[in-house]
Amino acid sequence: MIAILLAVAFGITFTLFTTPFFIRLFRKIGWGQFIRLDGPRQHAIKRGTPTMGGLVIVVASIISYFLANFFLGLSVEPSGLLVIFMFVGMSLVGFLDDILKVRKQHSGGLGPFYKVVLQSFIAVPFALLTFLVKDARGIPHSSMSISFARDTGINFSALFSLGIIGVFSAWVLYLLWINLIAVSSVNAVNITDGLDGLAAGAMIFTMLAYVVIGFWQSGQNCARKSLPLENISKCYSVNGPLDMSILAAAILGSLLGFLWWNTNPSKIMMGDTGALALGGAAAALSILTHTQLLFLVLGGLFVIEAGSVILQIAFYKKYRRRIFLMSPLHHHFELKGWAEITVVVRFWIIAGLFTALGIGLFYADWLYS
């Protein structure tokens, strides 16, 4: 618990006090935000606001994670490093996208196809590493089961009984599944990052959930020798849950400090550098804590935002009419006359409710297992 609190404290301190330096630096080198031309008119004043603030979040989170472990003499575990791999990898994809926007002087960076391809180049190696990297007992960090609050009975490895073709099919399905989770997550968070502080605030709730989940899984882990007999049937076969909880706490703290400068009116934006990184970290945590489908609830706001875009496009293609005044959903409410800060705070409340529901479902699964 002390390591978790330290990680939060380090994260807050780093971003709260160093972000002003990066604001001045990014403004000096011309890393300013470009606004989509078809967006709400009131967003025009945001043009030129320093962007790529995600660099601050990523660096602060990683430093805070290592410092928290160092001060308490804890060893860094492969589970945390695997999350960092996805965190940094997706951040690099976002950074490339942001750099192209700055150079083109336009809000369009990487095309959708190239963005997904690069995201997959990060997600697929991550999926392979979760099996190749094992703990001291020789157990991999992931499984081929689709998970909710723990692994379900849906297991791709069941195809192994079909021979070589079955083994090949199982691996292909597993890689596609992990890729779907990762790519969907990073793009959903990126879509949500359209108003000052919206994505950062919503992700704070999601990271809080993974702090709680990791901490609980650590106390109820199958590897613990002191586990009460009545809890053995409920234990979690998760590698390094406390390490992931510490990393989630570091990200949470970094987001809290960053939000001080990112809230309306924003002094700096996280850009795709931050949005893709956060989506990648959340996806990695859901995979390694075996809570893949529960992530749909924990990150419910991101699902709604991404869903609004999909619905808008699909409905327009079929009926040549729009469901929303504009997508993503937060822009719809802006055009309905809601103030930006009103939309953000109300969406934060929704994100918090989804997180509470998700944690409740997670605990209920343990209670009634």
Curated annotation (Swiss-Prot):
Gene name?
mraY
**What sections of the protein cross the membrane?**
2-22, 54-74, 80-100, 113-133, 158-178, 195-215, 241-261, 268-288, 293-313, 347-367
Pfam families, per the entry: Glycos_transf_4, MraY_sig1
Instruction: State whether keyword Transmembrane helix applies.
Output: yes
Q: What pathway is this protein said to act in by its record?
A: Cell wall biogenesis; peptidoglycan biosynthesis
**Necessary cofactors:** Mg(2+)
Q: Name one GO cellular component term.
A: plasma membrane
Q: Where in the cell is it found?
A: Cell membrane
Please explain the role this protein plays, according to its UniProt record.
Catalyzes the initial step of the lipid cycle reactions in the biosynthesis of the cell wall peptidoglycan: transfers peptidoglycan precursor phospho-MurNAc-pentapeptide from UDP-MurNAc-pentapeptide onto the lipid carrier undecaprenyl phosphate, yielding undecaprenyl-pyrophosphoryl-MurNAc-pentapeptide, known as lipid I.
Provide the GO MF annotations for this entry: metal ion binding; phospho-N-acetylmuramoyl-pentapeptide-transferase activity; UDP-N-acetylmuramoyl-L-alanyl-D-glutamyl-meso-2,6-diaminopimelyl-D-alanyl-D-alanine:undecaprenyl-phosphate transferase activity
The organism of origin for this protein: Tropheryma whipplei (strain TW08/27) (Whipple's bacillus)
Enzyme class per UniProt: transferase
Q: What name appears for this protein in its UniProt entry?
A: Phospho-N-acetylmuramoyl-pentapeptide-transferase
Q: What is the lineage of its organism?
A: Bacteria, Bacillati, Actinomycetota, Actinomycetes, Micrococcales
